[in-house]
Amino acid sequence: METKQIRNLFFAGQINGTTGYEEAGGQGLVAGINAHINCHGGQPFILGRDEAYIGVLIDDLVTKGVDEPYRMFTSRAEYRILLRQDDADMRLTEKSYQMGLAKQDRYDLLREKKESRDAIIRFVETYSVKPQYINSGLEKLGTAPLSHGCKLFDVVLRPQTTLENLADLVPALRAELDKVPASRKEEIIEAAEILIKYSGYIKREQIIADKINRLENIRIKGKFDYNSIQSLSTEARQKLTRIDPDTIAQASRIPGISPSDINILLVLLGR
């Protein structure tokens, strides 16, 4: 959000090539945070592509540029399962609390939700159910009976089951759900159920994001005179010089930068 020409001058919205609506609001938030950090000292606040749609938007503006007013569509994000609307508070509240933007009471609510959600997940991961106690109920729910005992987690994975309808079949699960604060019961149970049912997809996407994030930690800004690296393609030299990406991962997302160009930079860095 900070212009390269004038230090401490931050822009947001249409001047950056986006619409003036939600996209501008998101940029304004990040620009304001970083303007404050610049004045008082500290590391820049950067949201990753796996942390927030604002992170996707800003990264696209920096690495790809725009030919028409940019709109933030979910299709632009490669980590849509990690950027679900149901866990935005989990992803971002702690960051805002650390910067003084979220108050203590909001942070306490987040911790309460996380602890209750995780307790439910731990319970279903460790609690075993036996066919003779649950099969008649499973058949009424329209799902196949168990042929042998298994963890309750595996039963929750079935599309016909929910934590609530299984709690009617498993008294111990009902007792666990009753520990959740009554005022937030529906919200917290839903959060736990989503993590359980989508666990395989979430883990798979997180592994991919973690691999990319390792490249995000390799900083290259200011380390190269790209025009002097003759082994880079002409297009790569021109675009890397113009954009001056912060990290290897950011460089890899610039249109026209090939995997071989990235490998050359990694070799020069001794990686």
Where are these regions (language model features)?
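Short FAD-binding loop at a beta-strand-to-alpha-helix junction that anchors the flavin cofactor
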Residues: 1-20
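Short, well-ordered loop/turn elements at secondary-structure boundaries
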Residues: 5-6, 25, 66, 245
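Active-site phosphate/pyrophosphate-handling residues
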Residues: 10, 27, 91, 263
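Short alpha-helix boundary/capping segments
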Residues: 20-23, 84
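Internal hydrophobic alpha-helix adjacent to the cofactor/substrate pocket in enzyme cavities
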Residues: 24-47
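Mid-to-C-terminal Rossmann-like scaffold of FAD/NAD(P)H-dependent oxidoreductases
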Residues: 41-95, 99-102, 108
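Extended, charge-enriched "interface" segments that sit outside catalytic cores
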Residues: 76, 82, 93-263, 267-270
